[in-house]
Amino acid sequence: GMEKGQVILQHPNGSNQKVPLERFAKEDRDYIAAREAKHAGAAKAVNEALGFPAFSDGHFTTRQAGEIAAAMQLPLESESPVGNSWRLYAAVRKSGYKLFGAVPYSVALYSNAEGMADSLSIVFANKGDYGSKAGFATEHFNHKDGPDEPTSLADAMQRDHDLIEKALTTALGEGEKQRFGDTGTRRTALRWDWNDHSFLLALVEGEYVSVQVVASSHADAGGRSGRISDADLRARLEASVRRKDNGDVWVSGIPMVDQGPKGYCVPATFERAMRHMGVEADMYLLAMVGESSAGGGTVVEWLIENLRSQVYRKGRRLRDIAAQDLRIRDLQRHVDAGIPLLWRMCSMPEYNEIADKNTGTRGGEGHAEWLASVRKDFAKRGKPAENHHLCMIIGYNEKTGEVAVSDSWGKRFELRWVPIELANWVNNGDLILIQP
């Protein structure tokens, strides 16, 4: 691609190099000019199909992801050393928002560590959202310029698929069929190539309709993502551990995923952990692997079993740990290695109120006395059996007897501190690790 008179060259390792146009021979400059003119016309057609001016004559992966996010009106979700993400739950939060002529439910844009666009993942009609009343608007099925509203999930999915296929075919011609994705999320997709990146439209019967935009080289590999070396991963994980003089130790830089209005804490938390461990993941596709029921909800056991092979193929492994009683000394070695622990617990209102208050008042006047009363109270309470939830334990403080927790509810819930007695009150006895 081109940017301000410079040619952007992409190397096999994914890095980019900018070279001034005048350094090229005349015949190369003529070729580049002709290529850019051709792509400029196609970019206009692609943007008209998309509905937003998000694409340019430059290669997708040489663009700053923030520019694409701004063009598509996607709010920033997370900034981390492994890359940033932007996410919009369009069907419930942005009335009238359409992509390729259809209303998406989730739009997620990911960057690499340098901030360049890596992939765009869009989920349209799907079984987890069809018929849901959990904050879901009726906009998805209100197309004033088309046939009658769909009366079933199958009709809704077919409608979205047909609208998207028509938009992309008008812009880029007929698509070609291809198998795409890793084990557990592998599906047949229609593929359109343009300017060294690919648009992949999939309809998985009874599950979902999705569009992904990725580098053509990634599509050529069937969507199978690469693997970061063990040495590089361990170095990155160790560098993510933060320590304070007060005894706080925690894993920093874990990508945030906002699970939105649905009961998708399991796939959202898995996406966070997988990306932290160098494994590509998409919350919505993981939800389908986890057998989300119509209207939302995921079976954690099914999800874990289906993800084992996917994680293993990336040189990682899932490990289950029975932990009827959480003890800081048992958590230390994992946190010290930069590995978060996925934690099954009951997210009770009292727990969250105390977590917020404790995090906001730590070290303040009267805090120690209040915390002592909390410890005494919850050490003798009976365990709750509702509000089942999956989040992360990402830190500890041995001096104060606290653990750091992180929930997939957005930035405010990225890091909270709770006394170990409160954590044990809501503990369900299971921890899960993704290990090198």
Predicted regions and their residues:
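Predominantly the structural core of cysteine protease catalytic domains
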Residues: G297-E398
